[in-house]
Amino acid sequence: DRDRFRIRSYGSSGLGRMNGEFIHAVYEYDRFVRSFPVGPSNPAFTPLDQISPYFRNAVLTSEDGSFFYHSGFNEDAFRKSIATNLKQGRFARGGSTISMQLIKNVFLTRKKTVARKAEEALIVWLIERNRITSKDRMFEVYLNIIELGPNVYGIGEAAPFYFSKRPADLSLN
């Protein structure tokens, strides 16, 4: 049965990489853009508890409202995405959760292929099922690497760039 399925070793895959500081490399259209450390050595890195709850909740609401309650996949969004994409004959609608977006950005490329999507799903399943990285840490990394404007990556860069504020000071005003 599936509860007995265990992976004894991940080899050199580095699936636990997000648990500590790591270098994140940004690529667009297979072209290297820049890299930066995700962790305390980066002055723009912002721990989760120092990010405004308004911003955290806005991201959760817009990207993946059930992030802290699912195991990496939102089946309803995935089904709707597949139906729309098949109907239109192209990748027109995404069904990615925050977990899936994070794995794509940290471990894979942005190419929209079935093979890449399968890799993404497998890595998400491995990390979530085996609790390799906590949900809080995954959300923290996500908020520190997502592109929030041209060459603006993570809330530590975005808050001062757009609002002249620290991430903790973001509000609804």
Q: Which residue ranges define each predicted feature?
A:
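Juxtamembrane regions of bacterial inner-membrane/periplasmic proteins
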Residues: 1-173
